Amino acid sequence: MTQQQKQVTWVTLIVVVALVLDQALKLYIRTHFQLGEAHEVLPFFQLCFIENDGMAFGIEWFSKIVLTLFRIAAVGVLGWYIHLLIHRQARTGFVVTTAFVMAGALGNILDCVFYGRLFGYAGWLQGKVVDMLYFPLITNSAGECLFFRPVFNLADACITTAVIVILLFYRKDLDASLTKKTDDAKA
């Protein structure tokens, strides 16, 4: 098996496994929890059911359909970028990490495209993203979270973790791939 074939296999595996885990957890939470319901798993970790219209960690901007269409276009560009990385024989770690960004983006897109219609509260492209992971790491005496309030999902975790790993360990690879694209466009 060539290096390119191995990278394609890794990308496919990561995207499929991450999507299956993300969607399975979201569907479980959506069908077994009431909106706003929370269960403590560990003193610093809760599963709770919230939905958001926005981006990662509930950030909101633009209309729902515009945001969903933007996400779909961004995943298309990201898929093309991963294809170029593989074709240009980028390091496997960089390709794999970038695949986690794509997997996370696809996970949230599925919510937006299908969940509104599937659960009967909105049309196509207008679904809400299901979030459930909550880590109230530091709380006050009243139990109110003082540090790290976001509730997020596995897709958000894939994106955020991958971006941090890219910035910490693959910055040169990222810079080189972007410079290479610019140089190719000039030629």
Predicted regions and their residues:
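Alpha-helical transmembrane bundles and membrane-interface segments of multipass inner-membrane proteins
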Residues: M1-A187
